[in-house]
Amino acid sequence: MISGEQAKPLLITNVKPVAFGVEHSDATTDILVGKDGSISAIGKSLNAPADVERVDGKGAWISPGWVDLHVHIWHGGTDISIRPSECGAERGVTTLVDAGSAGEANFHGFREYIIEPSKERIKAFLNLGSIGLVACNRVPELRDIKDIDLDRILECYAANSEHIVGIKVRASHVITGSWGVTPVKLGKKIAKILKVPMMVHVGEPPALYDEVLEILGPGDVVTHCFNGKSGSSIMEDEDLFNLAERCSGEGIRLDIGHGGASFSFKVAEAAIERGLLPFSISTDLHGHSMNFPVWDLATTMSKLLSVNMPFENVIEAVTHNPASVIKLSMENRLSVGQRADFTIFDLVDADLEATDSNGDVSRLNRLFEPRYAVIGAEAITASRYIPRARKLVRHSHGYSWR
């Protein structure tokens, strides 16, 4: 069904599969999804029931449903989060991973009011700090050891292990002050106990990006990997670049996490030119970054494409790669009997001015344009975010355009 109420079979026609494996070519195909949301047939000119809903892909690409590994969607529970509907299916994203908006003290609310009602699949990294991002940066969640309750974190995970995929630590002096790298060490210990990955936000030192990488292990995630902040850019320090390159090769996941302050065109282009690609592309979408400069996942993907990240790698970075972090199987995703979970999109010629987190401007001449998110038997019409007129607003760091 197309954003409807009652489930009907869904016939998707004239789409080109990508990122489903070598057995699928560039030729177009049709996909029939049953009322129960599982794929019932794949091929050309399929016989479909009389009551079928039809979506004509018009030659668009179809991939596994896009995964955004870093968003903030505890709307109403934090002062920074947006609604899942603002960055999910209506933007072509079928899986959203909240990056530490909730801590152990309020995760139950996030589960009840955000995860359970949402049509998108929602997973979460649990914030190491008990309060999460209730009053983001105004009331930092990791000021000292009193902000961390190990026993309650373990209890929270035990009660919500189907939703929590890891531990999140923000390692930046804006949050931790002079506490440095200690929260990262504590977070890593807890992640080891729980046998889950840790995602670490790197930013204004301390802690140093170098120190963080030395603590992480295979499967862990460093988000904001291509930030342009002084003292935290991999392109201003050859030793740091070499360390990041080595850690990436050893299985530490470099995640974009664009956000309002954490992505640089110059850093990304230089790193990719030297062969260091991000493992995953994510937005760090929240109320202070959506309207400017991030917009959505499709635009963020387009930014990486513009700095010469290959098309196939861009798609992998929003499907298979982030899915592996949250233990979401992508095996045989386009097979009869599998639940339908797709993004239908075009890659179009464009001439769009886009800005990174440092204020540097680039023109995007190729754009990912989401058309539909397919979740079970429902095809939700999708599009990129169209920014509103910006205004100068005051916030925890001073003033900025939003």
Curated annotation (Swiss-Prot):
A Pfam family reported for this protein in Swiss-Prot or TrEMBL: Amidohydro_1
Enzyme Commission code: 3.1.1.-
Binding site for Zn(2+) 2: K168, H201, H224
Key words of the record: Hydrolase, Metal-binding, Zinc
A GO molecular-function annotation: deacetylase activity
Chain positions with N6-carboxylysine modification: K168
SUPFAM superfamilies from the UniProt entry: Composite domain of metallo-dependent hydrolases, Metallo-dependent hydrolases
Co-factor requirement: Zn(2+)
Positions annotated to bind Zn(2+) 1: H70, H72, K168, D284
Cofactor, how bound (note): Binds 2 zinc ions per subunit. After heterologous expression, a stoichiometry of 1 zinc ion per subunit is observed.
Highest taxon of the lineage: Bacteria
Site (Transition state stabilizer): R170
InterPro entries attached to this UniProt entry: Amidohydro-rel (IPR006680), Deacetylase_Atu3266-like (IPR020043), Metal-dep_hydrolase_composite (IPR011059), Metal_Hydrolase (IPR032466)
Keyword field contains DNA-binding: no
Keyword Lipid metabolism attached: no
NCBIfam families assigned: PRK09237.1
Family statement: Belongs to the metallo-dependent hydrolases superfamily. Atu3266/EF_0837 deacetylase family.
Job description of the protein: Esterase that catalyzes the deacetylation of acetyl-(R)-mandelate (in vitro). Can also hydrolyze acetyl glycolate, but with lower efficiency. Has very low N-acetyl-D-amino acid deacetylase activity with N-acetyl-D-serine and N-acetyl-D-threonine (in vitro). Theoretical substrate docking studies suggest that other N-acetylated amino acids may optimally occupy the active site and may in fact be the physiological substrates.
Annotated protein name in UniProt: Deacetylase Oant_2987
